Each structure stands twice: as structure tokens, then as C-alpha cells.
């Protein structure tokens, strides 16, 4: 473990909470101190759930550590059953309680409760949230699901969606409609929306559709081996992937690969004349491996973007992530340190970032357009409207979401033509995002510079130049602390002629070049010398 300001994943017990919260008739008894109850807010505040998660905490305190914490846990289990009357109970420890080493599974079994008890042993100091969700769902399936006779009509299970998942609610609806249009029934959706009774009848389906490998692949592999159910490998995000998914499902179900794409508009929108400004946009992707790999395909093959960087935070999927990146001629960035991600983005200077909530913060700091494609996300990415990522409607949503942060084609030309205009200057941002308020009393930078009291500058002969004859840039250079690099006015003006999406990189390279050469003032000549140096 490490101390950090921000993390992509919580501890494993948060993943277990996502599974329990998504289900009905399930209750999770968590051996944890009072401080770990913060996790409730993830669901009530961020996901806007109307009720708190079905989780009971032992909430032990420091004074309890010298007494019997095992009895405290058993009391919590007994009270949870009597109060909530669940169909099944999950038991486990938080990262803090793991240090006490109480056997939560054995303690719960000793109570002989009249419902199944699912034991969770989640290594809090080696694994994280997605593993916790994946492992919890696997243990639930092992405890409750059994082989059984198949349904008369061809059917499947949808595996992987959980509470707090990125657009899982809407993806379930979209994929269900897609399958029903092919004549395939959905036997159960799990864990989200499923009860323990639904888990028990998973074996009735003919095959499984794995929507989210991060949280459902272990259960899908177990079902393939134990229940003799094959599962899909294609995640239907994007037009191409959805068509591949339809073909894969049709082969498993023995039906015709036909799907209703009458609502699909993304291909024409991407190819139409008012969308050509998308072509060649440089994009950086980061998030969970499943969404990043799928989004990279959409970005390159369906939007016409150039993928310049991609990576994921979940190390369990490092191998497929690296294999996918090779297909784009890239080396995948696999890290859970947001500072490394920010460093990579600064070095690549993309025109668009597709990432998580953290990349949205990074993009805001760097002034780069951004769209969210993956958990973890904040409250605004749990919309009231129908907004799937999967299927044909999901492809439409991807197009709208990704192009919205970008500057429109005609407006980009206006920015090039009227760089100094009060309305169309680079810092104003795309007009459809709303203007940036500037206080009426705040003077422009050049006016402020001219308003400063002028100071004299020494000549080479030891005399002085009258203050009014000193150019503002020279005055700034004279007043700058020793060793600080100053841009002259003509160089700043020339820098603004460089497209805004690579201007930051050009500025950094020029300042680095000047520092290496021992220069403290950057002129137009320095700017072009630096350009020639880095172009070699």
C-alpha cells in the first residue's frame, strides 16, 4: 500500500460491496472499524442510489481490540439476519480488520444461520477493487449455482455488471434489446439485479455473455468448466465490435447473425462533411483495460483519430493491454499512479484525452479536451438519461460524447485566421462550451505590462536608456531573476502561430533548448533553432 492523493481503485472490500449492492436479497456483513463506513457514500452520493448499500459493519473501535472482536462480528451477523432477512449473506473483512485475523467465515458458519453464507477472503494489501468484485462474484456462483436442465428457448446470462459501474445500467438494457432482436432470451443478469435465487438458476442458460471481464471473467471461466456454458469474448463497444459480437453470439446460439441497426447513426455522422475535422486528431486513452481497448478501436477505425498513447490502471489485464497497444505501434502504460499518467500526457500533448475522472482533472489543468470512457467516474457520469456505451445506441453516444469537447471545424479555421480577435482567440475555448468570464476590471496582459512603471536599462558603455525607450520585453528581462528564462514579445507572438494543441509542447521544448544553451531570453531565432534541433 502507499499514501496517495487519488486512487483509481479502492480496496477489495469495496469491490465486494459493489457486488452486494447491485444484487437483491443479499446482505454483506463486513468486519470493519467505524472509519470504513465511508464506502456507503460511493453509492448514495456518487451513484445516486435511493437506499444505502445492504452492508452491516461491526464498527469496532480501539478499545475493542483488547476484548473479543470475534463475538462482536457474530453479533453483527446475527443482527443482520434478524433485521434484513436476506436470502444469503456474504462475510468478509476490510483492509483494517484483516490485520486482526479473525476467521469471519468460520465465525459465521458457527452461527448455523438458515441461509447460505458466502466466505470472502480478499487480500487487501495485494489486490484492489476490481479483483474484489470479480472474486466475490465467483464465490457467490460457486456457493449457489449448480448444473441444471437448459431452458427450452435459447437463452444466455449477462455477466459482470455491478453497482457503481460505468453505464452498466444502460448497457444491460441495450444488450438485452440486441439479443432479444436475435431471438435470444436473457435468463439472468448477474450480479447486478440478481437475487441469490437467480444465481442458483444460472445453469439453465445455454451460454454466457461476458460484458465486463474486470468483474465477471472468473465467474464466466468457472461456469464454462462447471456448468458447461461457453462465454463470449467480444465486448460490444463500437459499431465494429457490436457486429463482431452479433456474429459470435449467433454462432453460440445457432441463429442467424441479424441485428436491428435502424437506430445506428454513428458511421454517417463520422463520415459526413461536417465531421471531417475529426480526422487525424491525436488521442490518448487511459482507464480500465476493457474500455480502453474497445475505445481505441473506435477512435482509430470509426472516428478517424490517431491513437498516440493508451494504458490501463488494472495490472491484472496488463498482458492483453500490451498486446492491444502493439497493434497501434505503441507501448502500453500500465500504472495506478495518476502522476505517471499526467507525465505521459504532457509528453505526448494529445488533442483529446479519453479517460477516467482523474484524466478529466488532468485535462482541465493542461487545457486539453477530455471525455470519460471508464470508471472510476464522478456523479455527472451517472446520468438520468439513457446513455449506454454498448451496442448500436452506445456507438451513437460515443460519437456525441467524444466530439463534444473538441473545437468545431469552421471554428478552428476562425481561430487560425483571427488569433488576436477578442472572441476567437485560443484561450476562449470552443464556443459551444460557454464563454469564460473575465472580470471587467481585469486589464489585458499587454495593457498591464504597459501600465507598469518603466525602469531604465544600462547601456554597454555604462550610461542609461530613458525608461520610455526601453521595450517591455527588455524591461521584463532586466527585472527577471538571474537564470529565469524570459520570452521576448516577438517570440511570444510567433509562438501563438503554432496550433494551440501542440503549442505547450513547443514552449517546453524551446525553454529546455534555451536552458541547455545557457540562454535567458528567447527570441524568434531561439524558437526556430529549437524547432530545428528537435526535428532532427
Swiss-Prot record:
Residues given in the record as [4Fe-4S] cluster binding sites: 36
Disulfide bonds listed in the record: none
Catalytic residues (UniProt): 274
A single GO BP: photosynthesis, dark reaction
Cofactor: [4Fe-4S] cluster
Molecular-function annotations in GO: 4 iron, 4 sulfur cluster binding; ATP binding; metal ion binding; oxidoreductase activity, acting on iron-sulfur proteins as donors; oxidoreductase activity, acting on the CH-CH group of donors, iron-sulfur protein as acceptor
A Pfam family reported for this protein in Swiss-Prot or TrEMBL: Oxidored_nitro
Enzyme class, spelled out: oxidoreductase
Domain of life: Bacteria
Entry keyword set: 4Fe-4S, ATP-binding, Bacteriochlorophyll biosynthesis, Chlorophyll biosynthesis, Iron, Iron-sulfur, Metal-binding, Nucleotide-binding, Oxidoreductase, Photosynthesis
Stretch list, region Disordered: 426-448
Bound cofactor: record note: Binds 1 [4Fe-4S] cluster per heterodimer. The cluster is bound at the heterodimer interface by residues from both subunits.
Known pathway: Porphyrin-containing compound metabolism; bacteriochlorophyll biosynthesis (light-independent)
The reaction(s) this protein catalyses: chlorophyllide a + oxidized 2[4Fe-4S]-[ferredoxin] + 2 ADP + 2 phosphate = protochlorophyllide a + reduced 2[4Fe-4S]-[ferredoxin] + 2 ATP + 2 H2O
EC number of the protein: 1.3.7.7
Residues that bind substrate: 409-410
SUPFAM superfamilies: Helical backbone' metal receptor
Similarity comment: Belongs to the ChlB/BchB/BchZ family.
Function: Component of the dark-operative protochlorophyllide reductase (DPOR) that uses Mg-ATP and reduced ferredoxin to reduce ring D of protochlorophyllide (Pchlide) to form chlorophyllide a (Chlide). This reaction is light-independent. The NB-protein (BchN-BchB) is the catalytic component of the complex.
Subunit structure: Protochlorophyllide reductase is composed of three subunits; BchL, BchN and BchB. Forms a heterotetramer of two BchB and two BchN subunits.
Name of protein: Light-independent protochlorophyllide reductase subunit B
High-level lineage: Bacteria, Pseudomonadati, Pseudomonadota, Alphaproteobacteria, Rhodobacterales
Gene field: bchB
Amino acid at each position: 500500500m502507499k499514501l496517495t492523493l487519488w486512487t483509481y481503485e479502492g480496496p477489495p472490500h469495496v469491490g465486494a460491496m459493489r457486488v452486494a449492492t447491485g444484487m437483491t436479497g443479499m446482505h454483506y456483513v463486513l468486519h470493519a472499524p467505524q472509519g470504513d463506513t465511508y464506502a456507503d457514500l460511493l453509492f448514495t452520493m456518487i451513484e445516486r442510489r435511493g437506499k444505502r448499500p445492504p452492508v452491516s459493519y461491526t464498527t469496532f473501535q480501539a478499545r475493542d481490540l483488547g476484548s473479543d472482536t470475534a463475538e462482536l462480528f457474530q453479533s453483527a451477523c446475527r443482527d443482520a439476519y434478524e433485521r434484513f432477512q436476506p436470502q444469503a449473506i456474504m462475510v468478509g473483512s476490510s483492509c483494517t480488520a484483516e490485520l486482526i485475523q479473525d476467521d469471519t467465515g468460520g465465525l459465521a458458519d458457527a452461527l448455523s444461520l438458515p441461509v447460505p453464507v458466502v466466505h470472502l477472503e480478499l487480500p487487501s494489501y495485494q489486490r484492489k477493487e476490481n479483483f474484489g468484485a470479480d472474486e466475490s462474484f465467483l464465490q457467490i456462483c460457486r456457493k449457489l449455482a449448480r448444473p441444471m436442465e437448459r431452458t427450452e428457448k435459447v437463452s444466455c446470462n449477462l455477466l459482470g455488471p455491478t453497482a457503481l459501474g460505468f453505464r452498466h445500467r444502460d448497457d444491460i438494457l441495450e444488450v438485452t434489446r440486441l439479443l432479444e432482436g436475435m431471438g435470444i432470451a436473457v435468463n439472468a443478469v448477474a450480479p447486478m439485479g440478481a437475487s441469490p435465487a437467480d444465481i442458483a438458476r444460472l445453469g439453465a442458460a445455454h451460454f454466457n455473455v461476458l460484458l465486463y471481464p474486470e468483474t465477471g471473467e472468473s465467474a464466466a471461466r468457472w461456469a464454462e468448466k462447471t456448468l458447461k456454458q461457453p462465454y463470449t469474448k467480444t465486448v460490444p463497444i463500437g459499431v465494429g465490435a457490436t457486429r463482431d459480437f452479433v456474429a459470435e453470439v449467433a454462432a453460440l446460439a445457432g441463429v442467424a447473425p441479424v441485428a436491428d441497426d435502424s437506430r445506428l447513426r454513428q458511421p454517417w455522422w463520422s463520415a459526413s462533411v461536417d465531421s471531417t475535422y475529426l480526422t487525424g486528431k491525436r488521442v490518448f486513452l487511459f482507464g480500465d483495460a476493457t474500455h480502453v481497448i474497445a475505445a481505441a478501436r473506435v477512435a482509430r477505425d470509426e472516428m478517424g483519430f490517431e491513437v498516440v498513447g493508451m494504458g490501463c490502471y488494472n495490472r491484472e489485464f496488463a498482458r492483453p493491454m500490451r498486446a492491444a497497444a502493439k497493434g497501434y505501434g505503441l507501448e502500453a502504460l500500465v500504472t495506478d499512479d495518476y502522476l505517471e499518467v499526467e507525465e505521459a500526457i504532457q509528453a505526448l500533448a494529445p488533442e483529446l484525452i479519453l479517460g477516467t475522472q482523474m484524466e478529466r482533472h488532468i485535462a482541465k489543468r493542461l487545457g486539453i479536451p477530455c471525455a470519460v470512457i471508464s470508471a472510476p467516474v464522478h456523479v455527472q457520469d451517472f446520468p438520468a438519461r439513457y446513455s449506454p456505451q454498448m451496442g448500436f445506441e452506445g456507438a451513437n453516444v460515443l460519437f456525441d460524447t467524444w466530439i463534444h469537447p473538441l473545437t468545431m471545424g469552421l471554428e478552428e479555421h476562425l481561430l487560425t485566421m483571427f488569433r488576436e480577435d477578442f472572441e476567437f482567440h485560443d484561450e476562449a475555448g470552443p464556443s459551444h462550451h460557454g464563454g469564460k468570464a473575465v472580470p471587467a476590471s481585469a486589464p489585458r496582459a499587454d495593457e498591464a505590462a504597459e501600465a507598469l512603471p518603466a525602469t531604465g536599462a544600462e547601456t554597454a558603455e555604462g550610461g542609461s536608456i530613458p525608461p520610455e525607450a526601453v521595450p517591455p520585453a527588455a524591461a521584463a528581462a532586466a527585472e527577471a531573476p538571474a537564470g529565469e528564462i524570459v520570452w521576448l514579445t516577438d517570440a511570444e507572438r510567433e509562438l501563438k502561430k503554432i496550433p494551440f494543441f501542440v503549442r505547450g509542447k513547443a514552449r517546453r521544448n524551446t525553454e529546455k533548448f534555451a536552458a541547455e544553451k545557457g540562454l535567458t531570453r528567447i527570441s524568434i531565432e531561439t524558437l526556430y533553432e529549437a524547432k530545428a534541433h528537435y526535428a532532427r
